[in-house]
Amino acid sequence: MDDRRPDLAKRFALAAHSNAVLPILLVLEILETTIVPFPYEAIFVALCLAAPQRTWLFVAVTVAGSAIAGSILYSLGAGFAEPLADYLNVQEAVEAYKSTFSERGGALIFLGGLTPVPSYFVNLVAGATGYPFATFLALFSSSRFIRFALLGLLIHLFGEAILAQWSRLPIVVQRTILILFLAAVTWWSIAKL
């Protein structure tokens, strides 16, 4: 067996420093924001811990992915809401909801991007109700920027201390924590489907 082969943590750190990780991160954020609910933040945090000097680049790529995904969902809502409402014969309910969304939509869009709950419903409804696209995109992108910039800032401030504590743990404890974390991520992903 070759002892010179880097362990998983070192390989992940090498990947975090590679430019090849950026398009992968972009695609993962697009998928997470549109159709595949999974805890994207875990990947984001791990990358930021592995390559702290690239945190703001990871924030920028994440916000770009969110903007692309939000735009896709907005377009789907705008394109398919009316035919679907006609098919289901719920035009009056849709019109009533449009007026409510026009009054409170900005807050809903902003909170949808800021919180860790899946935001696809808000993005679809924004398109379905005809909420102004530029305003939608500005609100959603700025809320995602705030969310991931704060997370990046916390990692920047406390990441080294967390890694130092982690490295002091016995390997069996580290592996147990990782297994529990993966089990929790798997349960969370399945529960969101």
Describe each region flagged by the PLM.
Residues 1-15:
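Short, Lys/Arg-rich, polar N-terminal cytosolic tail immediately upstream
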Residues 11-62, 100-161, 190:
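Hydrophobic alpha-helical membrane segments of integral membrane proteins
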Residues 32, 69-73, 147, 151, ...:
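Alpha-helical transmembrane segments of multipass membrane proteins
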Residues 56-94, 103, 154:
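Membrane helix-loop-helix hairpins that form the core translocation module of multi-pass transporters
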Residues 75, 79, 157-161, 185-192:
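Hydrophobic membrane-targeting alpha-helices
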Residues 85-109, 167-193:
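Selective transmembrane alpha-helices of multi-pass membrane proteins
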Residues 161-167:
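Membrane-helix boundary connector in multi-pass membrane proteins
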